Amino acid sequence: MFESVVQLLEEHEELQQQLGDPELHADASRSRKVNRRYAELSRIVAAHAEWTQLGDDLAAARELAEEDPAFVDEIPGLEEQLDQAQEKLRRLLIPRDPDDARDVIMEIKMGEGGAESALFAADLLRMYLHYAESRRWKTEVLSQTQSDLGGYKDVQVAIKGTSDDPALGVWAHLKYEGGVHRVQRVPATESQGRIHTSAAGVLVIPEVEEVEEVPLDPNDLKIDVYRSSGPGGQSVNTTDSAVRITHLPTGIVVAMQNEKSQLQNREAGMRVLRARVLAKQQEEIDAEASAVRRSQIRTMDRSERIRTYNFPENRIADHRTGYKAYNLDAVMDGALDPVVESCIQADEEARLDALGTDA
């Protein structure tokens, strides 16, 4: 794996020269790609420099120890540091998910459990908004359908990052959140104090950055307009401002009613539609790839029950990684990093295993 480092170091130097070219910054799309790749390679360059320096230090300590026994005590510590640096570099050389630097569109939907599920969907939204705030990401609610008790039947939010580094990207962290989230607690509507189990679904898809990336033929779109409605189905607008867009080739349907303007709802709908079409295209690519390649690209299953939130025990458990902690109150306030990190580490391990199998 380390044989490729020399080529990456050369690529990093070439990108550094490109970043100094004023013409690059005139092309926003190309500039963004170069900056992201440069940020990604900068981590590898720094890790390689650390690994090389520690190797030199260890070699020097061994040589000096032959003449002066005082240097013998330094060798075990340097060996341990070198092993850690090598493992760090090894992980950085794992091929990244090409979408890691992208922003995302997240959809949270109530599932089994009725009103309690809708309230849990609202709790999940609050958790993700607080998590985004802690990472200084920007959020925008695109569409929402509230339930009678103040929860959400469905809510869509766009989450935008602030870094070109793929390792800090929104998709790199939130792609593991897609799936069924189960909650165990006493519902607000429960008079007997019994614990109920309900669930909400989360869908996370990378956002399209350029319109040209996912071209949509107007002839492939069926657009309906209607009056927006609130909880219970009552109309909240006197004009046909809500928009429903159907992509005929794929059957994907997007409905938007959050804005008072039909034009704004249409623009938001097209934004979500492009992301969903892109996600479908990626699914088809993954399906055609070999089993090993699929595991390298997307190793975490996001289609099944992924996590349980047990409020009476203040416990959160991720069923994919085995992560468990008794700080659910903090997690629901946005302290999601340890949970996400467990997913990232499990993903890296799976990718390393896949590379070993492929070799």
Swiss-Prot record:
One of its GO terms (molecular function) is translation release factor activity, codon specific. The keyword Protein biosynthesis applies. The keyword Cytoplasm applies. GO terms for cellular component: cytoplasm. It is found in: Cytoplasm. Methylated by PrmC. Methylation increases the termination efficiency of RF1. The modification N5-methylglutamine is found at residue 234. Keywords: Cytoplasm, Methylation, Protein biosynthesis. PROSITE patterns: RF_PROK_I. Peptide chain release factor 1 directs the termination of translation in response to the peptide chain termination codons UAG and UAA. NCBIfam families: prfA, PRK00591.1. Belongs to the prokaryotic/mitochondrial release factor family. This is Peptide chain release factor 1. It comes from Clavibacter sepedonicus. The gene is prfA.
